[in-house]
Amino acid sequence: ARGVLGARLFDLVTQNRRDGRLGFEDLVIAKSLYEKGTRDEIEEFVYQLIDTNGDGIVDRSDLESVLLVIFESVFSHEDSVSASSSLPDMVNVFLGASTFAKDNGTDAEKCLSFEEFKSWSALVPSVRKFLGSLLTPPTKARSGFQVPQLVHDKNISDDGLLLKKEFAWHIGGALSSNELEEWKLLYHSTTSGLSFNTFLGSVANDEGPTLLIIKDGEGCIYGGYASQPWERHADFYGDMKSFLFQLYPKASLYKPTGANNNLQWCAVNFSSDSIPNGIGFGGRINHFGMFISANFDQGHTFACTTFGSPCLSKTSRMVPEVIECWRVVHRSPQQEKQEGVKGSVLERFKEDRNMLNMVGIANSSN
């Protein structure tokens, strides 16, 4: 961890002694709490971690400092933050879903309570994953650090994409590591036109999960993760892996609540008003969580219990301006298995073994 986040983590691990010394016992205690504690204990540790001043108050400036460190750490080997967005702008996007309602007893701005932190971190799981993995080995698949490679034709520049690397990292917070290797652009309305038939043709040969992303006429960007292929159905289909997300002007993610199974919608060439032609997610017929008509010229987003999501756009009725669809390329089970069994058992558990060696029990026969 870098900067203020690294300094704060050091203070917490050394139990705030402020003597500049880190003992092995400090590390063992911290890791047992940070990685093996109860859910509430881990959340409390992370909440203390984002209190960068250690004053018991988590305000907006604390979160701004934390997010700056996160972005610098995650994207240090990338092309920095996307050219179309400055770092402060991206920080504001990720703070958009936070609520500072707690009175800190002074005339200063409101602060973030522990419960408000838990609510916010559920909406930005990539941030929570990063903060929860700072004491783990810095591997390629380190939780919270993975950014998928975005593959697209050269006739579309990075600046012309709705899906920026920071947004991909945000969405990836809800996915497994084997889904964060590569995402391939299948359809972009700027080059293919706003055409439902072209869209369906572009995604027809890809059976894996996809990301549908929309920028509407008001400038809002949002979408959904479709776990199942886009195929003709007369009713809702899909599974509980699907979710909705917002990317701009605020970043948030909404997973299924279990309230119903109205997850994914794809109706093509039906003549009944009760089966609206188009694609969407959640809610109910004609009152979807997100929906684009088959003409790709209009749609709507309503608050829905399927994902516990609010209206994703500024108003419930929206006009799509740009539509993208990305294929989430899965790493094969064989590849994952091969990577998982490299080396001997002792080599694979080298970190734990080193810790045991330090306390003299790794080679004990008892």
Language-model region placement:
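Phosphate-recognition beta-domain surfaces
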Residues: 1, 6-7, 11, 29, ...
